[in-house]
Design a protein with these regions (language model features):
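Conserved Walker B catalytic segment
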Residues: 2-20
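Short regulatory helix/loop adjacent to the ATP-binding pocket of P-loop NTPases
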Residues: 9-10, 27-42, 57-59
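Structural recognition of the conserved hydrophobic beta-strand(s) that form the central parallel beta-sheet
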Residues: 18-24, 45
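Conserved AAA+ ATPase "SRH/arginine-finger" region at the nucleotide-binding site
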Residues: 42-55, 76
Length: 196
């Protein structure tokens, strides 16, 4: 966090110098109240590959099954890479940064919310499935959004109007991450999981 103050000072003294700073989340920085270079920085999000980037190497089936994360795409064992990504990045980073008090509840939340991928998000239903308070699930969703792992797309309406209840749709940022988080039972039909 202290580096941002140094970057700010250098930018103030020499406008021609530019920096590229990377990170997985600004959540910890915001909580610490550090200098976020207001008005001097651009926020760019890096997303998984898109078909056009891969051109002839693109496989629709591979993209739907394993996703398009650069670390996973083309790996000898994509499933192992996805599991490692989820364990190391999502679970361990959340635990290390102390973002959740009960990692067991958060793990149940990840499994429960995986069933909401591509659907309207009912925070109350997910909270009931996890056995936690609604406010806890709201916080968990905010963590996933801050880590750029998921997003909620708001309901679209042509005209501005007051809606008493409107649930946005929940999406994980990558199909491979979603499929790896989603629990599979012995009677699950893969085509049903895929939405066919």
């Amino acid at each position: 966090p202290e580096i941002l103050d140094v970057v700010h000072l250098i930018m103030e003294n020499n406008k021609s110098i530019q920096f590229v700073l990377t990170g997985s989340s600004a959540r910890k920085l915001r909580r610490a109240g550090v200098n976020l270079l207001g008005g001097r920085a651009l926020k760019l999000s890096m997303h998984p590959f898109v078909a056009k980037e891969l051109q002839g190497e693109f496989s629709l089936e591979g993209a739907l099954v394993h996703g398009m994360l650069p670390i996973v795409y083309g790996a000898a064992s994509p499933l192992r890479k996805l599991e490692a990504y989820i364990d190391l990045y999502i679970r361990e980073e959340i635990q290390q940064e102390g973002l959740v008090r009960d990692l067991g509840s958060f793990t149940r939340f990840l499994e429960a919310i995986s069933f909401s991928h591509g659907s309207q998000l009912s925070i109350s239903s997910v909270a009931r499935e996890c056995g936690v308070k609604r406010t806890t699930v709201d916080g968990y969703v905010d963590i996933l959004r801050d880590l750029l792992v998921a997003d909620v797309v708001p309901v679209f309406s042509k005209r501005a109007k007051r809606e008493l209840v409107s649930h946005g749709k929940f999406y994980f940022f990558d199909t491979g991450v979603w499929r790896t988080l989603r629990p599979k039972g012995p009677l699950d039909n893969p085509s049903e999981i895929d939405g066919a």
